[in-house]
A protein has these predicted regions:
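Helix-hairpin-helix
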Residues: 1-5
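Glycine-biased, small-residue-rich flexible motifs in mid-sequence functional cores and linkers
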Residues: 7-12, 16-277
């Protein structure tokens, strides 16, 4: 098996790091159950010592996607490495946000490093390798089995200074990541959500239990006093201006039309919109 694995590692252009390797992430050495080795595609560097994990549901609302992308973009723009699991939904949005800022991002897989899951994230996988790293502790060719993901989550929590949970139900695997972060002495952050949405039950519960409420990246930077620029929040970019074309449309709306537009931040049944207006 060892000879076969070595051959696959060389063929796949993978770096194999053991606990005693100088490039093995120092943060993982501080947790009680570090992986004995990591398969790496891309690069892990000293900058990654200032890292935040952004995790959440695989089926987010537009609110969750926008928040995950926006906060990750701002953090990455401040020199923070964004760590997530490359799953659909919040994970993918977090990676995209970091990439949009030309920042660093690391994806931790619950499969072999050569197994792209979901398969439609192939382009994202390649972009992450170019702007950071994809890592896994599972042998090459390992399928993305359900039991692999809780094990994967401890690496996500171990690599970072804090974990931000964006949209998660009460049974979400993201809460496992948050729980591990607490066990490892990391900070836990949560994005508040709609109290009527089951996708926010987990995040709102975390806030009740003491997780730090986050509205933007500055909340995280100030709490941890970290920034690649040396000044917490110095790398933050202002929110993009509303396009002139949209301003003209908004200016021509009646008060009733404005009220309806304000309710369309996520998919709604027509009966619900009528009831609320």
């Amino acid at each position: 098996w060892v000879e076969k694995e070595i051959g696959l590692i060389e063929k796949q252009d993978v770096v194999f790091l053991t606990l005693i390797h100088s490039d093995f992430p120092k943060a993982l050495l501080s947790i009680p159950d570090p992986p004995p080795y990591l398969y790496v595609k891309g690069t892990i560097c000293k900058k990654d010592e200032n890292a935040i994990a952004v995790v959440g549901t695989r089926v987010p609302t537009q609110y969750g996607i926008s928040a995950a992308e926006g906060i990750s973009r701002e953090l990455a723009g401040s020199g923070i490495t964004i760590v997530s699991g490359m799953a659909r939904g919040i994970d993918a949005a977090a990676h995209r946000g970091a990439l949009a800022a030309n920042g660093r991002t690391i994806a931790v897989l619950g499969s072999g490093i050569d197994v792209i899951y979901p398969s439609d994230n192939k382009k994202l996988y390649e972009q992450i390798i170019s702007s950071g790293a994809v890592v896994s502790e599972f042998p090459i060719g390992t399928a993305p089995l359900a039991e692999n993901f809780p094990q994967r989550n401890r690496i996500i929590s171990g690599l970072v200074k804090g974990v931000l949970v964006v949209e998660a139900s009460e049974k979400s695997g993201s809460l496992i990541t948050a729980g591990l972060a607490l066990d490892y002495g990391r900070d836990v952050f949560a994005l508040p959500g709609n109290i009527t949405s089951f996708k926010s039950k987990g995040t709102n519960k975390l806030i009740k239990q003491g997780a730090k409420l986050v509205e933007d990246a500055r909340d995280i930077l100030e709490e941890l006093s970290i920034s690649g620029t040396g000044i917490a929040g110095a790398g933050l970019k202002p929110a993009p201006a509303v396009p002139d074309s949209l301003r003209k449309i908004q200016a021509g709306l009646s008060s009733e039309e404005e009220k309806i537009i304000s309710l369309l931040d996520e998919p709604s049944f027509i009966d619900t919109i009528i009831q609320r207006t």
